[in-house]
């Protein structure tokens, strides 16, 4: 048996708390969170020749440098952790991530490393080079 409560978190994050019961004689209650978030252009600072990522390079219009990139990783990690309250979200869907490098940095080189998330991601044909990913 599953039931859920949706709520909007900061900005464009949708979180779903799911409750259920195991099919056992004890009827133990299970609760977990599922989050979907458009993190809006999580790009690293390196040019990918197969993608149109010029806007997010250090010498480009956004002046996207390593310190801004690291701050965005830390901010994303902080919000994901805060959404989970005492229990981190079981699943986190992320929109607009550039590549495997940013996901590896987010899950292994930010405060999220403590939560041991793994991930899968798409390789979309989007010309800007943005993909979607799932942390689990």
Predicted segments with their positions:
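Bacterial Sec-dependent N-terminal signal peptides
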Residues: 1-18
């Amino acid at each position: 048996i599953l039931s859920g409560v949706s709520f909007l978190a900061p900005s464009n994050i949708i979180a779903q708390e799911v409750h259920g019961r195991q099919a056992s004689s004890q009827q133990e209650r299970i609760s977990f969170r599922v989050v979907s978030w458009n993190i809006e252009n999580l790009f690293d600072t390196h040019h990918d020749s197969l993608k149109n990522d010029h806007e997010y390079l250090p010498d480009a219009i956004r002046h996207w440098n390593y310190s801004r990139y690291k701050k965005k990783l830390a901010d994303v990690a902080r919000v994901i952790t805060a959404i989970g309250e005492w229990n981190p979200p079981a699943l986190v869907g992320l929109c607009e991530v550039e590549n495997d490098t940013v996901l590896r940095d987010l899950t292994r080189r930010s405060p999220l490393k403590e939560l041991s998330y793994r991930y899968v991601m798409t390789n979309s044909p989007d010309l800007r080079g943005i993909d979607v990913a799932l942390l689990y």
